[in-house]
């Protein structure tokens, strides 16, 4: 950043950094997205569900996933089925009240209708897991989400 830009507070976005793909022992094969400054790949859960995975660059100077990011991810993986159930259970009363004609959905029926979308590991160590609807568009283009803080607390919501 030039001296004049610094004096007048003019922000220049960091230059795009291109990085070669990596094979991380925890996250698997990842490719770098310089636009979003994150690593992206695919993850298969213990139950066989396929998620996209994105891992934020920890800082402007450090780009590779940190040990702490790996630890919070590894702590969330065994909870994926529980988090999906909590997300469905939280949303079901609103869904049945507003979005269903005829018989209301059961928890099991709605659970089948939502499919894995993304697991995002943020630089602040929050992990957000999201599920989207099947082609039936039951969620109206939204996603059920579970945001898990580094201490393991889960906040459930609907986004999009």
Predicted region positions:
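Acidic, proline/glycine-rich low-complexity IDRs
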Residues: 1-31, 108-160
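A general marker of short, structured functional hotspots
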Residues: 7, 23, 32, 47, ...
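Alpha-helical protein-protein interaction elements
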Residues: 19, 24, 30-31, 35, ...
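Contiguous hydrophobic, core-forming segments of folded domains
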Residues: 26-76
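Short linear interaction motif-like sites in intrinsically disordered regions of transcription factors
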Residues: 33, 39-40, 92-96, 106, ...
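Short, hydrophobic/proline-enriched secondary-structure or compact coil segments at domain edges
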Residues: 41, 84-88, 129
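Long, charged/polar, surface-exposed segments that mediate recognition or autoinhibition
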Residues: 54-115
